[in-house]
Amino acid sequence: MKTVYYYSRPNCALCEEGLLTLRLVQEDLAFDLQILNIEEDDALHEKYMLMIPVVVCDGEVIQYGNLDYPTVYEGLDDEI
């Protein structure tokens, strides 16, 4: 089973909404979800601080910012 990485940070309303969208996609596609707090890693913080939330699978950014179900589903369906 593939692992999908979700980069976010605490106290981020957009990240919370994005996680709900990602959980809906997870109901339709089987994947492991790893949630990573970018504030715990300087390199991740520098890379993603202006993009969060970010969905990544196999090293490819599927979508970032304001996540929507169709884009995330289609992007992950191609990878999984």
Cite the ranges covered by each PLM segment.
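Local sequence-structure signature of Cys/Sec-based thiol-disulfide redox active-site neighborhoods
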Residues: 1-22
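Small/polar loops that bind or transfer phosphate-bearing groups
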Residues: 7, 36, 64
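Generic recognition of short, well-ordered alpha-helical segments
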Residues: 17-20, 46-50, 67
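Conserved helix-turn-beta segment immediately C-terminal to the redox Cys motif
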Residues: 21-36
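Thioredoxin-like thiol-disulfide oxidoreductase module
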Residues: 34-51
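A short, hydrophobic beta-strand/beta-hairpin element that forms part of a small beta-sheet core
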Residues: 53-61
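Non-catalytic, surface beta->alpha helical segment in thiol-disulfide oxidoreductase systems
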Residues: 60-80
